[in-house]
């Protein structure tokens, strides 16, 4: 399959950037006047924010706070056309000073928080306006950006389905269990008791023969992808009415969550091939696979360069199981669309929290 290697993307710890030619088609439906109004409001908001951050950075220079000045200056994200910027909320503010920091550090952080909170409030108003104007996908993305600036923005957290959990910070509502060794032999893969781990996240059920640590890391990656997919394909899983209900204070969730998505991580490629070969004669040609008949993503550890493949296969699962496509979509036609949407998510790339 041809893949446009000119596609560029940047992702960071708290935000992701995606670029894909299809994006322009998606945005083409927005009337020019509406797009211009949003662009002007956004430009004005960002200009004020940038000015405040610049003043704070200069003050840090005067006080010899070199590291604080660098964080402040790098906070504004450079934006490039053809890229979509998506944000992953953190449980807590990643730049919060450690307890016992100097008085100057605390004063810097207080002012930094003040400017970011003002930006968050402005973004929140933009989000409400966009939703009301019939552009809920953009509103939903903006709500995530609100939490980059103010992780404790209570209304944005509520709308997006978060709850505060003690010192752990903000967490998605949904049952999660830490990785635990299997008590009985696995019914499918021959793993003995205590030789594999199960891990539940809000949206995934993970089984692996690797380790508890890798189960936890895989769960984090899958939840990140899930959050980004929901931002990129908002209309696929919910709608404007649902978002307006939440913004208006409604308690009904944006969507009734389907069953958790199954992911299996094998210890290595050899185990992956041996386990799946009986049902997939050409499995050795793959580096990860989503099998619709199993409703499961199968991956293997030991090669972190394959993370794009993980995203690709997990994206197929999201499209297939969130709204149940017909079995094996693309076999009889529109294969380009099925693969193109998975490649869209494969193009994700991380971008640092600050700058």
What are these regions (language model features)?
Residues 294-355:
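Zinc-dependent metallopeptidase catalytic helix centered on the HExxH motif
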Residues 96-106, 113-118, 131-307:
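Non-catalytic architectural context of zinc metalloproteases
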Residues 60, 79-81, 150:
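Alpha-helical junction/boundary sensor with strong preference for TPR arrays
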Residues 42-43, 74, 144:
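Alpha-solenoid helical repeat scaffolds
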Residues 33-43, 87-114:
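Repeat-mediated protein-protein interaction surfaces in helical alpha-solenoids
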Residues 17-29:
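Bacterial N-terminal signal peptides
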């Amino acid at each position: 399959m041809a893949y446009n290697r000119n596609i560029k993307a940047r992702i960071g710890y708290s935000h992701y950037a995606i670029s894909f030619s299809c994006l322009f088609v998606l945005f083409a439906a927005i009337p020019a006047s509406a797009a211009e109004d949003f662009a002007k409001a956004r430009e004005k908001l960002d200009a004020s924010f940038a000015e405040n951050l610049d003043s704070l950075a200069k003050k840090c220079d005067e006080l010899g706070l070199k590291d604080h000045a660098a964080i402040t200056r790098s906070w504004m994200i450079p934006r490039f056309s053809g890229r979509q910027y998506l944000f992953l909320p953190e449980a807590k503010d990643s730049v919060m000073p450690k307890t016992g920091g100097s008085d100057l550090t605390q004063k810097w952080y207080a002012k930094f928080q003040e400017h970011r909170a003002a930006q968050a409030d402005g973004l929140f108003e933009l989000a409400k306006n966009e939703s009301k104007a019939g552009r809920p996908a953009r509103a939903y993305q903006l709500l995530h950006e609100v939490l980059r600036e103010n992780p404790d923005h209570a209304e944005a957290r509520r709308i997006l389905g978060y709850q505060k959990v003690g010192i752990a910070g903000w967490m998605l509502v949904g049952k999660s269990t830490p990785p635990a060794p299997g008590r009985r032999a696995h019914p499918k893969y021959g793993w003995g008791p205590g030789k594999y781990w199960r891990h539940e996240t809000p949206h995934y059920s993970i089984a692996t023969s690797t380790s508890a640590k890798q189960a936890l890391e895989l769960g984090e990656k899958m939840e990140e992808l899930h959050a980004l997919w929901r931002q990129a394909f908002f209309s696929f899983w919910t709608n404007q009415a649902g978002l307006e209900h939440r913004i208006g204070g409604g308690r009904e969730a944006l969507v009734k969550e389907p069953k958790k998505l199954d992911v299996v991580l094998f210890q290595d490629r050899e185990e992956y091939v041996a386990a799946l070969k009986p049902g997939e004669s050409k499995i050795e040609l793959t580096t990860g696979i989503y099998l619709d008949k199993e409703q499961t993503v199968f991956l293997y550890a030991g090669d972190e360069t394959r993370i794009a493949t993980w995203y690709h296969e997990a994206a197929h699962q999201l499209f297939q199981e969130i709204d149940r496509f017909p079995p094996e979509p693309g076999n009889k036609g529109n294969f380009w669309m099925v693969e193109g949407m998975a490649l869209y998510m494969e193009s994700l790339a991380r971008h640092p929290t600050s700058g």
